């Protein structure tokens, strides 16, 4: 199982692709436990998001059919500033990408912080 962003409601633009609603999570776990004769399978724990990045057709073998879609919250999410720094916005890992990131080229900083930082040679 590869779990997406399992939060009550999408709160950032990235969640429009990765959100995993709680009702879909419960259905997914049930299907992962109860499905028979599947063998080895890698599946994404993600709702039926219109903007999803992942091909999750393999989940059909489990009988998993998500019903929730982050798109219902898109207008609200996109009306707010993106809380992720530039690194988090660029990569699939979101806010986790910059944890213990040691490269000092400013890539993990916000544009405002980068403007205040001394430039590197």
Residue spans of the language-model regions?
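Alpha-helical substrate-binding/gating segment
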Residues: 3-9, 19-40, 48
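Short charge-dense sequence patches
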Residues: 5-12, 82-86
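Short, surface-exposed loop/helix-turn segments at secondary-structure junctions
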Residues: 13-17
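C-terminal amphipathic/interface module of NAD(P)-dependent oxidoreductases
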Residues: 53-121
């Amino acid at each position: 199982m590869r779990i997406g962003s399992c939060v009550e409601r999408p709160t950032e633009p990235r969640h429009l692709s990765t959100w995993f609603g709680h009702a879909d999570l419960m259905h997914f776990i049930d299907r992962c436990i109860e499905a028979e004769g599947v063998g080895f399978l890698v599946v994404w724990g993600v709702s039926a998001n219109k903007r999803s990045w992942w091909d999750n057709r393999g989940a059909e073998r489990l009988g998993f059919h998500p019903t929730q879609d982050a798109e219902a919250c898109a207008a609200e999410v996109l009306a707010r500033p993106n809380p992720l720094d530039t690194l988090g916005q660029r990569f699939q890992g979101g806010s986790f990408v910059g944890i213990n990131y040691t490269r000092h080229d400013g890539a993990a900083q916000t544009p405002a912080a980068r403007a205040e930082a001394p430039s590197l040679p």
